[in-house]
Amino acid sequence: MGEFKIQSKFKPTGDQPKAIDTLVQSIENGNRGQTLLGVTGSGKTFTMANIIERTQKPTLILAHNKTLAAQLCAEFKEFFPDNIVEYFVSYYDYYQPEAYVPQTDTFIEKDASINDEIDKLRHSATSALLERRDVIIVASVSCIYGLGNPEEYKKLTISLRPGMIKDRDEVIKKLIEIQYERNDIDFARGTFRVRGDNLDIIPSSSSSKGIRIEFFGDEIDRIREFDVLTGNIIGERQHVSITPASHFAASEETLEKSISIIEDELEDRLKVLTAEDKILEAQRLKQRTNYDIEMIREMGYCQGIENYSRILDGRMPGTPPQTLLDYFPEDFLMFIDESHVTLPQVRAMYAGDRSRKTSLVEFGFRLPCAFDNRPLKFSEFESKINQVVFVSATPGEYELDHSEIVAEQIIRPTGLLDPVIEIRPIKGQIDDLYGEIQRTVQRGFRVLITTLTKRMAEDLTKYLKDLNVKATYMHSDIDTLERMKIIRELRLGEVDVLIGINLLREGLDIPEVALVAILDADKEGFLRSETSLIQTIGRAARNSESKVIMYADNITKSMDKSIKETERRRVIQMEYNEEHNITPTTVIKGVRDIIEATKVSEEKENYESEVKKAAKKDIPIEKLIEQYEEEMKEAAKNLQFERAAELRDIIKDLKENSK
């Protein structure tokens, strides 16, 4: 069994050793809650990695959005290259939940576009938890939604070894039961094909590697792993576990029992609706539910099968759903990153889901069991936590009240200080800001500006562009991919000024930023609260020459507290630097593409590992280029132009390196 082992040329420095020791001691003492209060740029991620290495517990890291989860996942993969680091976020590229608007008698059918790549990573995460303990999963709050019963998932997993007495048709029947499809033409993830005595399977947790089961009579003769694209054999396997193609897969016996319970619940609900003289609703419910029952009976699933998950799991009404947290062993460790934002998100999930489902049940679109296909209530989420470390520069009351220990991490390994804060009057703020932008850009640095409204962000961007400033804005209408593209352009200098509302706070790691301007800083509210201001100030703490300008006519309580807290930290940092003879140095970081962590980072990793493998096996670069060119053409044919462009760049690099 693998152990967590950090691979890094760095050693803990500054406040890190003390914070690591304090938190590890607290965890080993059995304390349930602890807080890591770490300023921006103090190396909280590295501290978390060291705690994982010291405690050796399977770990869940909860982030408040996909982008931050992707960034963390990429960093933990670098720290733990020999261990399993997985990415678990919502697999919907687009999601329109089922809903009914009684005022206009409008039923909105569920409409969703599932990202196959992310679905693969979700399966990879759950199957890793069944097989190993050295597993880190970085997840968004979507991990508190129902996922299917882990016991059923484990029970349905097919375990195969060479020498086992297994009939080929028996294995095929089992694969169909766990929702794999036979497809001899379009061989893809979650399908299998049969060629004579060979059975080829692409597991739900992979898309590039397949498993070939070779039979001799009714015995498994050999199991081999192969490259799906080229068909080349990668190696022999002494054991393979094939996990279900869906987290909601169930055995025939479970499905039969479930159908009987669904029919009973339908009968009871029809009596209630008929007694209330809701004839139309009763007819609608009967028709829709009977259709679902037929689909489950014939196919093993139906559209919206998650609405019957409570029945499939054998749970009582009102009991919490099974989630990713239930796939972890009991002694797991959880980190809640940027907890001041993540915890309120967890709290809000249940109420929004419940209000939407009420009208669906009331008007005969769903059975009451649909209420139990839901995210966890906050109290249920708390009950599933074993031990937790809240991580934030500005922890809230909840975190502090539920922590036995608070470890402060104020000193940065780079010696960087919290930025100097200047307060300037609102009158003439735009002209003053333009002058500051010019001076900052001339020095080769970037600027972040926070406004109070989306309109102001757009208007200011237009104004600056008219003055030939390379400016752009970022707000909630911009999707994740585009957002990461903008951040990358900012880091590369294709954009000098980024303007936003509250999107500039948590998790943006941009060392090139030397000026953060906060417009209308004295407009008290959630965008200018103490927490918000400290987080925004933190965006300037990656550069030794950075400063923050607050444009305000009055000093509010929030401003006063955030300025005093920044000054307190700055004094501690300056004293430490003086004592240890440290000169603050700007963080130098490569511009990594972390778009979704499902595409670019994985492709880069695949590319690097392919090149290493090719070197080990003495595969000529020309042969590798040929393989990538085939894959590029295939991607272009399937209209996967981003993938094709990525492969084109890899081919270009390979050609240049081979000269």
Curated annotation (Swiss-Prot):
PROSITE patterns for this protein: HELICASE_ATP_BIND_1, HELICASE_CTER, UVR
**Keyword S-adenosyl-L-methionine: yes or no?**
no
- Lineage: superkingdom: Bacteria
Is Nuclease there in the keyword field? Answer: no
Its Gene Ontology biological processes? nucleotide-excision repair; SOS response
Keywords attached to this Swiss-Prot or TrEMBL record, sorted alphabetically, are:
ATP-binding, Cytoplasm, DNA damage, DNA excision, DNA repair, Excision nuclease, Helicase, Hydrolase, Nucleotide-binding, SOS response
Q: Where in the numbering of this chain does the Helicase ATP-binding domain appear?
A: 25-182
Intervals of motif Beta-hairpin: 91-114
**Residue intervals of the UVR domain:** 622-657
Helicase C-terminal domain sequence ranges:
429-582
Job of this protein = The UvrABC repair system catalyzes the recognition and processing of DNA lesions. A damage recognition complex composed of 2 UvrA and 2 UvrB subunits scans DNA for abnormalities. Upon binding of the UvrA(2)B(2) complex to a putative damaged site, the DNA wraps around one UvrB monomer. DNA wrap is dependent on ATP binding by UvrB and probably causes local melting of the DNA helix, facilitating insertion of UvrB beta-hairpin between the DNA strands. Then UvrB probes one DNA strand for the presence of a lesion.
Q: What is known of its domains?
A: The beta-hairpin motif is involved in DNA binding.
Q: How does it assemble?
A: Forms a heterotetramer with UvrA during the search for lesions. Interacts with UvrC in an incision complex.
Record family assignment: Belongs to the UvrB family.
In its UniProt entry, what is this protein called? UvrABC system protein B
Species source reads Clostridium perfringens (strain SM101 / Type A)
